[in-house]
Amino acid sequence: MDLTPLLFAIAFLFNFRAALKLLIDWKGMLTTIGFVKEAYGSLDRLPSEAALEDDERAPTFLHLVPAYQEPEIAGTLAGLFASHYPHGRLHVVVVTKEEEERAPHPAMGVATAELVRRFRTELPPYAQKMLWHLALPGPGRKAEQLNWALRPEALREILGESFDPSRVFVGVSDADSLPDPNVYRWIAGEELGGRGSLAYQGVTLSLANFTRLGIRGRISAIQQSSIFIRVSIARLINEFKRVRFVERLCARAPALAPVLRPAFDLFFRRSQICLGHNQFVRLDCLQSLGVFPTTGVTEDSTLGYELGARGILIRPMPMLELTDLPETPEKIVRQNARWYKGVLDDVSYLWRTWRRAPTAYNLAQLCRHVGNKVVEWPIAAGVYPVVGFLGWHLAYVYRDHVWLFVFSLAFPSVALGLTVWVGGIVTQELIEELAPYLPRPVDLRRKTFKEKFWGTFRCQTYWLLATRGAWRVLWALARDGRYEPAKTDRISR
């Protein structure tokens, strides 16, 4: 049996998809950059701190910072307390672990909780009332720490006995986060302007420690940041628009709604992405979900799926946040291994969700998650180069068919060119355009020929490390039947 036609068709489709995906990524970056620039250009139209102080409708923010072995927690807290928002409507809660207090990391000398207490003593009296510290008594990851702060007794202690959950937003920052000081004002402006949402996800960039990184680390920082702007936020922007368009279409043609809506959910809906920081969910919505999910390693991705399954759209938020990139290749691999383990954990959640409610949307989420994340993540770095070469090779089998021959050569060539152009050149230029809006000045320019050369032609460095992370999980599961993800180490350099 001659498999040449089948292999040719597979290579043709894969190369076409690769080229199309890179073009979509390019468009996604442009969409997000435009979204951010427009918002920062209109900051003067946001409600002032004084106006929010006098407006009883202004939301209250309960900002949670889960922390464990975090030597630079004071920097994150300083960023949060620099926010332009009424003091009485902002509560910052740091949740540490009792086990760390009993046995601090030797390189730190003191526990994170002690660093929080020291920071609190340096605050003026009014600010001390805004900062709370809780300690998780038993074992648990980030989700358990967050949920410890959302216990009814903790909420009553922090917010008072008569708080309204529908007017409280729960924000989440990691202990290395540096938020924009206007993030609360932006959300308040949307809420007071009648454009409110139950959940918001802001733009996060892994550039906080950019100047400390070497060339390889800077390439990875730019590439990891690009994921958030070209995929995560761009998808939320477009999803919001598309869903609203289909809703208007169904309202105008109700007879088509029973067919149109399921078809749209099955073929065109995308997964909603929560990033786990620079993220805000209204308290009553979060309580209706049973607070943060603890079934998997990555509570943020599961939360995004839970919100989507309930028909809740996450609103994209243009305010920027800086976080650290793990500073060694091994740490990047471990970070991606933890994320991939979360991807595997989400399969069981999506399967249960679909069995419980077998809708077109839930089926699409399960299938796309398995195909685009579980399967593609560990193999993409190897499959696409092989398929590209195969496409070039098999094109000559059909050289007598002019158009087929031309397109067969063109798609892998275009995909390769776009990999360098979009991944190595456009991504750098567009992220540099965000520099004026960062919460802290960061010089993102490539200054030497070596930086420019390697940044252009080694733009796949980060993806190779991410692939190693996925295979580390798969190998551990095959060998030991389990994988225990490690926390990102921010102590050693």
Short names for language-model regions:
Residues 61-69, 83, 95-97:
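A conserved hydrophobic helix/loop-capping motif in glycosyltransferases and polysaccharide synthases
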Residues 167, 173-190:
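Acidic donor-binding/catalytic loop of UDP-sugar-dependent glycosyltransferases
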Residues 23-58, 352, 357-365, 396-493:
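Juxtamembrane C-terminal module of membrane proteins
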Residues 102-167:
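Active-site-proximal specificity loops/subdomain of glycosyltransferases
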Residues 295, 304-322:
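Catalytic donor-sugar/metal-binding loop of nucleotide-sugar-dependent glycosyltransferases
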